Design a protein with these regions (language model features):
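Nucleotide-activated sugar donor-binding and catalytic core shared by glycosyltransferases
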Residues: 27, 66, 168-170, 174-212, ...
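Conserved small-residue-rich beta-alpha loop and adjacent elements
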Residues: 107, 111-184, 188, 216, ...
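Residue-identity detector for glycine
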Residues: 1, 11-14
């Protein structure tokens, strides 16, 4: 089966392609604007949106399955191994599991505002660490479409906007899931750009994400060693590697 090739190259003569730069700049601006309001939302609003997203995912299961079948058909046409196709595949049970995952995130303690390592100086000054939203989190990941909803849930819970770049193998599934998530945000009067999917599957765009340090505050690669090494090597955005994906606050 074909895995995403992370030996990313620029356009001719190694130059960054201007259209890719503009594409990412526009997305970055939208996400940064959304992050300002997301970071100010109270936990009840954030949890309400997560619960609405879970409800919408279950409600739109038929649509999600239909779009997922397009990815499955493309994968089989390319000769992908059945074991890898299974990672791509959505079923009603898996969609229910994804929705339940969002409900579990909603039930977690609010990470925003927690103060740790509080110390009192001799002069009485109290110094500690307070958890606050980062702003915009970028996540580059591979085939599993469940990551799309999980990443959205963890980022919204921690008051962050998220830019997602999934693997090209599951583009139809990811577009469908994100459209449902954005609908849920709209229904709860929250900025839809709290979650934006990079729909351009050109690998040079993935490279450009790693350069969008004006707008993306932290980049998280989730996938195989090749992906993680490429991001760590090429990114000018601060990187948190895969083992830290649950620590988004």
């Amino acid at each position: 089966g074909r895995k995403e090739d992370w030996n990313i190259v620029y356009g001719r003569e190694g130059k960054r392609e201007e259209n890719h730069m503009k594409y990412m700049e526009q997305i970055g601006m939208r996400s940064k604007a959304a992050s300002r309001s997301i970071g100010l939302l109270g936990q009840n609003r954030r949890n309400e949106a997560l619960k609405q997203a879970a409800k919408e995912l279950k409600k739109q299961a038929a649509f999600l399955l239909e779009e997922n079948q397009k990815d499955i058909a493309n994968a089989r046409e390319k000769g992908m191994k059945e074991s890898l196709i299974d990672r791509l595949m959505l079923t009603r049970e898996r969609i229910a599991g994804i929705a339940d995952g969002l409900l579990q995130i909603a039930d977690l303690e609010d990470p925003i505002g927690i103060v740790t390592d509080m110390k009192v100086r001799p002069n009485g000054l109290r110094i500690g660490k307070k958890r606050v939203p980062l702003g915009v989190v970028g996540i580059i990941y591979e085939s599993r479409p469940n990551v799309t909803a999980d990443a959205f849930g963890l980022c919204l819970k921690s008051g962050n906007a998220v830019i997602l770049r999934g693997g090209s193998d599951c583009i139809f599934s990811n577009k469908a899931i994100v459209s449902v998530l954005r609908k849920a945000l709209n229904a709860t009067q929250i900025e839809e750009d709290a979650v934006i999917l990079i729909e351009n599957t050109d690998r040079a765009v993935a490279q450009e994400i790693m350069r969008t340090n004006t707008y993306i505050d932290v980049l998280i690669p989730r996938g195989g060693a090749g992906l993680i090494q490429t991001v760590v090597k090429n990114s000018t955005v601060p990187v948190r590697s895969e083992e830290h994906t649950s620590e988004l606050q």
